[in-house]
């Protein structure tokens, strides 16, 4: 029995594993590759130079691999690459990259992308990320592993969301969120360390304590950003479970181009 509904349109050149399931009225473009056991919901459109891994579930009416919403785009063969075991719910839009960046949009593994999410051109979404319903990622946004973005939130282009961080619902984010930090509001402001999330992911009490100390240096002690970075480096060399996560935090802060939320 065919796993492709008779009303679906599969353009010549598309490469589909024989176990892929395609729902009614879905369209798969000529330059699309889809891996084993992936399911495509009814009325979805998978187009562009798009590669999708294994065991993904793409919901009804999703638009995956569409042209970037960038007025400079001139039909260059830019790409979208999606990993494995992702859930991409109904009405989500994910666009290919642009040549002004690296020419590719990426989505890692084991992500939970809820309904009506937008992932713009050149975004880099890590693994084990949750993007809640109606979260909107502008172009060039980077989201680290295990980050959570609340529903109805808007993220400005080129913003970075650090690993294990959390952005509350209905927030407007215009600068970077450091790893491990909770942020919320319009505009988004810091609200502490994501303690519960870190506990769930097996971070030790010592590591969480070190991150809390790092947060105080960054946000609570009245230090300038430059002075805070010096003390964060000292904290990262203290010895113990907290060294690596604190080092990741200060590296992120030092590499920020848009500045961090303060």
Swiss-Prot record:
* Pathway linked to the protein: Glycolipid biosynthesis; lipid IV(A) biosynthesis; lipid IV(A) from (3R)-3-hydroxytetradecanoyl-[acyl-carrier-protein] and UDP-N-acetyl-alpha-D-glucosamine: step 1/6
Q: Does the entry feature the keyword Cytoplasm, yes or no?
A: yes
One of the record's GO molecular function terms:
acyl-[acyl-carrier-protein]-UDP-N-acetylglucosamine O-acyltransferase activity
What is catalysed by this protein?
A: a (3R)-hydroxyacyl-[ACP] + UDP-N-acetyl-alpha-D-glucosamine = a UDP-3-O-[(3R)-3-hydroxyacyl]-N-acetyl-alpha-D-glucosamine + holo-[ACP]
Its localization reads: Cytoplasm
Cellular component terms (Gene Ontology): cytoplasm; membrane
Q: What is its EC number?
A: 2.3.1.129
Q: What class of enzyme is it?
A: transferase
Q: Which UniProt keywords apply?
A: Acyltransferase, Cytoplasm, Lipid A biosynthesis, Lipid biosynthesis, Lipid metabolism, Repeat, Transferase
Q: Function of this protein?
A: Involved in the biosynthesis of lipid A, a phosphorylated glycolipid that anchors the lipopolysaccharide to the outer membrane of the cell.
| Complex formation | Homotrimer.
Record family assignment? Belongs to the transferase hexapeptide repeat family. LpxA subfamily.
Protein name, entry field: Acyl-[acyl-carrier-protein]--UDP-N-acetylglucosamine O-acyltransferase
